[in-house]
Swiss-Prot record:
This is Uncharacterized protein L116. Residues 36-56, 101-115, 123-276, 282-303 have a biased composition (Basic and acidic residues). Residues 30-303 are annotated as: Disordered. Belongs to the mimivirus L41 family. Residues 61-72 have a biased composition (Polar residues). It comes from Acanthamoeba polyphaga mimivirus.
């Protein structure tokens, strides 16, 4: 800057030689702006010395004022080019020399000095020169999405799914399925990661392998000891030691169990002692016969007695003649009857004879708790005299002969309370004279012959009024004369009491078939499907006219379809 200062001063002095100095100062130096700068007293001494050493610069009054002796920051001169140079280099004042110390004070920058400071930072010095107050979005350390330390999805330390320490599925320490120590399916004896010498009496609450939720005492599904796939030998050994029902003190349990057993045994002995049945069995058979002959005409059990008076007896302990004590009353059974009964778990009563359900005298052999009555003969449901063998209150009646549904005289073998009638012959649905074997309450009828759907005379075997008609021959859907074997009926949506023929299907011996290149399925929407021997060939969507023609012809030939 000193050399630049000298250069401008010499140029200015050369211009003063041609122009009067007094005139120039009065007219040209009106725009001089003097800005004082506060500097310490120590810095003034070197300035005075420098002015004494340079006597040639004294006549330049435009730059250093004689009255103030203060530096001038800017000077406006008549030459325009020179003013431009002054604008590009605004500070013409001589700056003080730097101190000799190593710490050099940085120059103060003001808004008047229109300077642009450009600093070049290398890659090595970037981390040192970066400002600590930088934007939170530009800093890779503070960015929420770019920072590897704060990012939820990219950080390997905080990521929930990628962290091997926190991941539930990948961590070998926390994984439920991979950990050999916590695995639900791996037995501790079969696992090759665990040693067999580990103590079995480890703490249940301090061990990391038996946490609060996976403890074999608290968890029913995760414990390897209680696993369903464990072996039977291991389950028996370990379940006994870790059963929920066992208390902490085994000695108390044993003592309680022994006391309960003793009390039960004593109570049983006491209860069995006063029973008169044992006393009667100890007596001789002659005494039994004498007692029976004396009391049989008066106290012998009759069939008309209410069933609540009887009790259950095991079949093995039934003697020829015995007595039973119940509610301070005695009942006797004679040897001639040879029929006994028992109560089952549901409260029903059954009569037996020679190890088979049987009861004579046209009486029910089974009486259930809901009131159902069944008649048996030699172990088979049977009742003669055209009477029902099974009577279910509120449901219906059934007729049986020798264990099969049967009724003679063209009468239904099953009559339901809702109006359903079914005809059977020797256990098979059957009815002769072209009559339906099943008649339901809704009016639908079904024809059977020897247990098979069948009806001759080109008549439908299944009739559901207003729904469909089906033709069967020997149990197969079939109809001859190129007529549909299934005709569906649908109700007109706008007309309440009007019906129309819907879809039509042609069958031959149980398979969809129609010869002559005609469709085997004709829908009411006009879609045609072609079949041969049950195999579908193709379909045609343009068949509305064909449907109308076929439906109208069927209504004319078979008027009962829409009745």
């Amino acid at each position: 800057m000193d050399s630049l200062y000298k250069w401008f001063s010499t140029i200015y002095q050369g211009k003063d030689t041609c122009i009067d100095q007094d005139v120039f100062l009065s007219t040209e130096i009106q725009s001089i702006e003097i800005q004082p700068e506060e500097k310490p007293s120590e810095e003034k001494q070197p300035e005075e010395k420098s002015s004494e050493e340079k006597p040639k610069l004294q006549p330049v009054s435009a730059i250093n004022s004689e009255k103030t002796q203060k530096p001038i920051s800017s000077v406006a001169l008549p030459n325009e080019d020179f003013n431009k140079l002054l604008y590009n280099f605004p500070s013409l004042s001589r700056r003080p020399q730097p101190k000799t110390t190593t710490e050099r004070p940085q120059p103060k920058t003001t808004m008047d000095d229109k300077q642009v400071v450009v600093t070049f930072i290398t890659e090595r010095g970037r981390s040192c020169e970066l400002s600590s107050e930088r934007s939170r979005y530009r800093s890779p350390e503070r960015s929420r999405y770019r920072s590897p330390e704060r990012s939820r999805y990219r950080s390997p330390e905080r990521s929930r799914y990628r962290s091997p320490e926190r991941s539930r599925y990948r961590s070998p320490e926390r994984s439920r399925y991979r950990s050999p120590e916590r695995s639900h399916y791996r037995s501790p004896d079969r696992s090759h990661y665990r040693s067999h010498n580990k103590s079995t009496e480890r703490s249940h609450y301090r061990s990391t392998e038996r946490s609060r939720y996976r403890s074999p005492e608290r968890s029913h599904y995760r414990s390897p000891e209680i696993s369903r796939k464990r072996s039977r030998d291991e389950s028996r050994e370990k379940s006994l030691g870790r059963s929920r029902k066992m208390s902490r003190d085994e000695s108390r349990e044993k003592s309680l169990n022994e006391s309960h057993k003793r009390s039960r045994d004593e109570s049983q002995e006491k209860s069995y002692e006063p029973r008169p049945a044992k006393k009667l069995r100890e007596k001789s058979p002659d005494e039994h016969q004498e007692k029976h002959q004396e009391k049989s005409p008066e106290k012998q059990v009759e069939i008309t007695k209410p069933l609540e008076d009887y009790i259950a007896l095991p079949k093995e302990n039934v003697p020829d003649v015995f007595e039973i004590e119940k509610s301070q009353s005695t009942r006797y059974f004679s040897e001639k009857a040879r029929i006994y009964f028992k109560n089952t778990h549901d409260g029903s009563i059954v009569w037996y004879k020679d190890d088979a359900i049987h009861r004579d005298g046209d009486l029910p052999a089974v009486i259930e708790s809901d009131g159902t009555v069944k008649y048996y003969r030699d172990g088979k449901i049977h009742r003669e005299g055209d009477k029902p063998a099974i009577i279910i209150p509120g449901k219906g009646k059934s007729w049986y002969l020798d264990g099969k549904l049967h009724r003679d005289g063209d009468e239904p073998a099953y009559v339901s309370n809702d109006g359903t009638l079914k005809w059977y012959r020797h256990g098979l649905l059957h009815r002769e004279n072209d009559n339906p074997a099943i008649i339901n309450l809704d009016g639908s009828m079904v024809w059977y012959v020897d247990g098979k759907l069948h009806r001759g005379g080109d008549l439908p075997a299944i009739i559901k009024p207003g729904i469909c008609f089906k033709w069967y021959v020997n149990g197969h859907v079939h109809r001859d004369n190129d007529l549909p074997a299934i005709i569906n009926i649908f109700k007109m949506p706008k007309l309440c009491n009007m019906y129309r023929i819907g879809d039509m299907v042609w069958y031959q011996h149980g398979q969809r078939h129609r010869s002559g290149g005609k469709p085997a399925i004709v829908t009411f929407r006009g879609v045609l499907f072609y079949f041969e021997n049950g195999r579908r060939i193709y379909e045609s969507p343009n068949g509305k006219e064909y449907y109308n023609m076929t439906a109208n012809k069927l209504m004319m030939d078979f008027p009962y379809l829409l009745e």
